[in-house]
Regions:
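Conserved catalytic-core segment of nucleotide-activated headgroup transferases in glycan assembly
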Residues: 27-33, 39-40, 174-201, 308-309
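Short internal beta-strands
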Residues: 44-54, 199-202
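Nucleotide-sugar donor-binding patch of glycosyltransferase catalytic domains
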Residues: 65-68, 252-326
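Active-site regions of enzymes building and remodeling cell-envelope glycoconjugates
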Residues: 71-75, 102-103, 117, 126, ...
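Conserved small/polar residues in nucleotide/adenosyl-binding loops
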Residues: 1-5
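Active-site donor-binding segments of glycosyltransferases and PAPS-dependent sulfotransferases
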Residues: 49-102, 106
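Mid-sequence helix-capping/hinge segment at a functional interface
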Residues: 107-181
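Donor-binding and catalytic core of enzymes assembling or modifying cell-surface/extracellular glycoconjugates
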Residues: 179-268
């Protein structure tokens, strides 16, 4: 039963327990719906229950983001287990030990398929909310004052980017597809030669180069990384190059132009796309705008395995310059 119908059917419900078993990017797609849900039920407490383990479906770092989401009163963690085939059959039984008996327990589900126009639309429909005409970007929540670690990286980035064409931020690894781009160093060095300052959360770049800054994820949380980028955006031309992972959604939330490297054929990719993303692909998707797709010829990539391809760094730089170069 949908939440709205359940609340109507049982006025004794005192709160809502939302159960999350997803990755960081997946969470970002939920944020417009969560904000709208809270607007509809402002007096109802929202508790979050998050899987405590890293697996192919889940990241406990989602809990850290929910702790900074003002719409949630409490965040709990549970020991879950993924289903080997069907992600919706995730075992979240352990969550119920901390759910008050007068709370409505709701797993955060969405449909993902060729027939689905967008994941955000699916989430609105799942929770009986009117689907917006235009898909809203993810909502991010930052403190009024940057954390000391954010200020430290901000100082480094400001000094490095001074006088450059802009900053290019790289995220070229994906937990969901178990992939890391193998040409990080060459790509970063090529962008630096083109006059850009390069930042990355993916390891493998030219650490000794003064025009390169790798984010230490042990020092800077994912939300702090986004906060850092939001501050840099106000001072520098800022771009993203990312494989289909967290920073597709994050770049949309931050309003940053993104050269999105679609590293495997996924006919459901329109579920995850935002208009700020120029999609590099070796397969033209009929459900994505054609003008937002950059076709990659066979000579522009090599095979990583039977499913995944690696785009050659010189081609990535060529496409980047064509779309965003000055």
């Amino acid at each position: 039963m949908y939440k709205r119908q359940a609340l109507k059917a049982n006025p004794n419900v005192k709160g809502v327990a939302l159960i999350f078993f997803m990755g960081i990017g997946d969470y970002l797609y939920t944020t417009p719906m969560l904000a709208e849900l809270k607007k509809k039920y402002p007096g109802v407490p929202f508790y979050a229950y998050v899987g405590a383990q890293f697996d192919r479906n889940n990241s406990p770092l989602v809990g850290k983001l929910l702790e900074e989401n003002p719409h949630f009163d409490k965040v709990f963690y549970f020991n879950g287990m993924r289903h080997p085939l069907i992600w919706k059959n995730y075992n979240y039984e352990d969550a119920f030990k901390n759910i008050p008996k007068d709370f409505l327990a709701v797993p955060v589900y969405y449909d993902y398929g060729v027939h689905v126009p967008h994941r955000v639309t699916s989430l609105f429909e799942t929770f009986s909310l009117p689907a917006p005409k235009d898909v809203p970007a993810p909502v991010m929540y930052f403190p009024a004052t940057p954390a000391p670690a954010v200020r430290e990286y901000l100082t480094l980035a400001r000094a490095g980017a001074e006088g450059k064409k802009g900053i290019v931020f790289l995220q070229l690894d994906s937990r969901g597809s178990n992939y890391t781009y193998p040409h990080m160093k060459a790509l970063a060095e090529g962008l630096i030669k083109e006059g850009y300052y390069v930042m990355s959360v993916t390891k493998g770049g030219p650490l000794a180069n003064p025009n390169y800054l790798e984010i230490d994820i042990k020092k800077l949380s994912i939300n702090q990384t986004w906060h850092l980028l939001s501050l840099l955006k106000g001072e520098f031309a800022l771009y993203v190059i990312a494989v289909n992972s967290v920073f597709w959604a994050a770049s949309a939330g931050l309003g940053l132009p993104n050269l999105g490297l679609q590293h495997w054929i996924d006919k459901k990719v329109h579920n995850l796309w935002y208009p700020n993303i120029e999609v590099v692909t070796n397969y033209i998707y009929p459900l994505l705008p054609r003008e937002k797709q950059i076709f990659a010829p066979q000579e522009s990539y090599t095979r990583h395995n039977k499913k995944i391809i690696d785009y050659k760094p010189d081609w990535v730089i060529k496409w980047f310059k064509e779309k965003f170069g000055k």
